[in-house]
Structures are given as structure tokens and as C-alpha cells.
Amino acid sequence: MTKKPDLNDPVLRAKLAKGMGHNYYGEPAWPNDLLYISPVVILGTIACNVGLAVLEPSMIGEPADPFATPLEILPEWYFFPVFQILRTVPNKLLGVLLMVSVPTGLLTVPFLENVNKFQNPFRRPVATTVFLIGTVIALWLGIGATLPIDKSLTLGLF
């Protein structure tokens, strides 16, 4: 339900005459946003990307040498937690079951949470706790995947 302005109100008419109130009742997208603001944002984004590419060019990587194999081949960074699970669990079937249990556990969170109508994370303690614990475990596994196998579980701290 939207509030409709009373255009017979003299206070509102005075505000509208001064140009006030256009944000409250909406502002047309044409021509203000689409003609003036959007091209500036698009060109600014392109300029930032080109500037970063020119000022800080990234290297493609080391040239390939077919006669020298690296000691340990690491996957891409987003596969580090999965790689760490498969590397540390002795039974590969158990490792696959652990990987399947992650999305399965995430699917059960809405059913465990009784107050799922709230968007505030402080009013959804189960979902917030699952998220925080999952984030810490994923970071721990991801950092551990970059270390040698004997230091990977303790991250070299103990």
C-alpha cells in the first residue's frame, strides 16, 4: 500500500514548489538516471578497470616446462577446502561423504530455524552460528591446503 500525497495541502504544495519532496514521492528514471547517471557509472567502471590493467598488469604465470613437474600441484583457490578434506581424510569414500554433507547440512538449516521470517541475523541464531562456524572451517581448510601435509591441520601453529 503506497501513500498518496494530498496535493491540496498548502504545506506540501509549498515544499513541491521549492523542489523538495521529489525523493519521497519518486523521481522518474528518464532522463535523470538513464541519461546522465548510468553512463557516468559505466564509463567510470570501465576507466577503473583499464587503469588497473595498465598500472598493475598481472602475469599469466610461469612458462610451462614439460620436463619439470612441480612437487605438489595445487588446485585453484576456491577448491582449497575440498582439496584439504580429500588430502587429510584417509578413506576417500569418507572424504566424498564429508563433501556431500556440507550442502546437505546447509539445506537443513531453514528447517531447524523457527523464526525464519526475520532478516536480522541476531534474530536467527541457528543460521548465524552455522554460517560463522562454516566460514571459520572453510578458512581453516583453505589455509591448511597451502601448507605441507604435516602442518596442514594445525596451520603450523602447534
From Swiss-Prot:
Keyword Electron transport set for record: yes
Compartments in which it is found: Plastid, Chloroplast thylakoid membrane
Topology within the bilayer: Multi-pass membrane protein
InterPro entries tied to this protein: Cyt_b/b6_C, Cyt_b/b6_C_sf, Cyt_b6/f_cplx_suIV, Cytochrome_b_C_euk/bac
Gene Ontology CC, one term: chloroplast thylakoid membrane
Predominant subcellular localization, coarse grouping: plastid
PROSITE patterns: CYTB_CTER (PS51003)
GO biological processes: photosynthetic electron transport chain
This protein's UniProt keywords: Chloroplast, Electron transport, Membrane, Photosynthesis, Plastid, Thylakoid, Transmembrane, Transmembrane helix, Transport
GO molecular function terms attached to this record: electron transporter, transferring electrons within cytochrome b6/f complex of photosystem II activity; electron transporter, transferring electrons within the cyclic electron transport pathway of photosynthesis activity; oxidoreductase activity
Ranges annotated as spanning the membrane: 34-54, 93-113, 129-149
Function: Component of the cytochrome b6-f complex, which mediates electron transfer between photosystem II (PSII) and photosystem I (PSI), cyclic electron flow around PSI, and state transitions.
Membership in a protein family: Belongs to the cytochrome b family. PetD subfamily.
Subunit structure: The 4 large subunits of the cytochrome b6-f complex are cytochrome b6, subunit IV (17 kDa polypeptide, petD), cytochrome f and the Rieske protein, while the 4 small subunits are petG, petL, petM and petN. The complex functions as a dimer.
Protein name as catalogued: Cytochrome b6-f complex subunit 4
Species annotation: Liriodendron tulipifera
